[in-house]
Amino acid sequence: MALMKTKFNLKRRVKLAQGLWLMNWCCVLAGIALFSMGVFLKIELRKRSEVMDNDESHFVPNSLILMGSLACALNAFPGKICYDSLDPTKFPRWKPMLKPYLIICLIFNIFIFFTGVVCFLTRGSLESTLAHGLKNGMRYYKDTDIPGRCFLKKTIDLLQIEFKCCGNNGFRDWFELQWVSNRYLGGRSKEVKDRIQSNVDGKYLIDGVPFSCCNPSSPRPCIQLQVTNNSAHYSYDHQTEELNLWSKGCKEALLNYYTSMMSSMGGMVFLVWIMEMAVMIGLRFLHTCLETIANPEDPECESEGWILEKSLKDTIKSSWELVKSMGKLNKVETAGGEEAGVATVS
C-alpha cells in the first residue's frame, strides 16, 4: 500500500504547484542567507586566525557556503517545473528528470541536516583550537622585532580590549610566560639579571599583565604590575579586593562568541532543512499525481499522489534486496574477470 496516498483534483493540483513554486523561491532566498552567513563566519574566523591552532574550525563556514550555493541552484530548477506542470504540453519533457532530481534532493537534505548538527557540536573542537592558538599567541607576544610574529602583540591587545578578557583562562596566565622583549628589559639592571637567573628556563617572569587587560570602568588606576604584591600599592589586597583587570579568559570569551553565533546559524540551517523537506515531499506528490492522471486529455479528472509507492517497510526491504543483488552481480563479475585472467596466463 502506498504511503500517504492522497486524491487530487485539478484545483488541488494547481494549488500544490503554485504553493511549491512560491516555496522554491523562498528556499532560494534562504540559500542566499545561508551563503551570506557562511561568508560572515569565515571572515570572523579569519580575523582571529592567529590565535587559532588549525583550520578545522573553517569546516562549518565552508559547509554553509556550499549548502547555500546548492540550495540556490537546486531550488531555481523546480520552480520552472512547477510552473510548467500546469501546462499538459510542457510537463512531459520534465518527467524523466524528476526522479533523479528527487534523489539529489534527498542526498542534499541529508547533508544539510548533518551541517546543522555540526553547527551545534563544534564547541569541543573549537575549544581545543582556541586553547592552543591563544597559548602560542601569548608566547610570541614579546616578539615584536621578529618577522612573522611582530603583529601578534597588536592582535592579542585588540582581542583583550574587544572581548574584555585577559590571558587564555585568566590574567594569571601572563605570570607563567615572558611577555616583555629582552630589548626593553635593560640587561645591566641587577634586578633583571637576578630575576632571569632565578628562572630555570632563563625567562623574565613577573606578576604583571599587558595594559590591554585593564578594565577602564574601574575607579582605581590600573594595577598591571606587581599584581600579587600588596605592599607595592596603597590600600590593596589582591585576594579580597576586586581587581581592575578583566577576570574572564579570552578562550571562554571567544568560545562563547563563536558558539552562540554557530548555534544561531544551526537553527537557521534546520529551518532551511524543514523547508527543503517540505518542497521535496510536495514535489513527490506533484510528480505522482500528474503521472496517475487517467486521461491526460481531460485535465479535470482526479488522480492520486503519494510519497512512496509501497509502505515504508516494503520500500526498505526492496531497497535492501536491490543492494544485495548489486553486490552479488559485482562478485560474479569479479570472479569472471579472475577466471579470464587465469585462462590468459595458462
From Swiss-Prot:
PROSITE patterns: RDS_ROM1
Principal location listed in the UniProt entry: membrane
Pfam families: Tetraspanin
One cellular-component annotation, GO: plasma membrane
Species assigned in the record: Xenopus laevis
Membrane topology: Multi-pass membrane protein
Tissue specificity annotation: Found in both rod and cone photoreceptors. Specifically in the rims and incisures of rod and cone outer segment disks.
GO biological process, one term: cell adhesion
Keywords assigned: Cell adhesion, Disulfide bond, Glycoprotein, Membrane, Transmembrane, Transmembrane helix
Gene assigned in the entry: prph2
Subcellular location: Membrane
Keyword Disulfide bond recorded: yes
Carbohydrate-modified residues: 229
Entry's transmembrane regions: 25-43, 62-80, 100-123, 265-290
Cytoplasmic topological segments: 1-24, 81-99, 291-346
Quaternary state and interactors: Homodimer; disulfide-linked.
Family: Belongs to the PRPH2/ROM1 family.
Domain of life: Eukaryota
Functional summary from the UniProt entry: May be involved in the morphogenesis of retina outer segment disks and the development and maintenance of the retina ultrastructure.
Annotated protein name in UniProt: Peripherin-2
Lumenal side: 44-61, 124-264
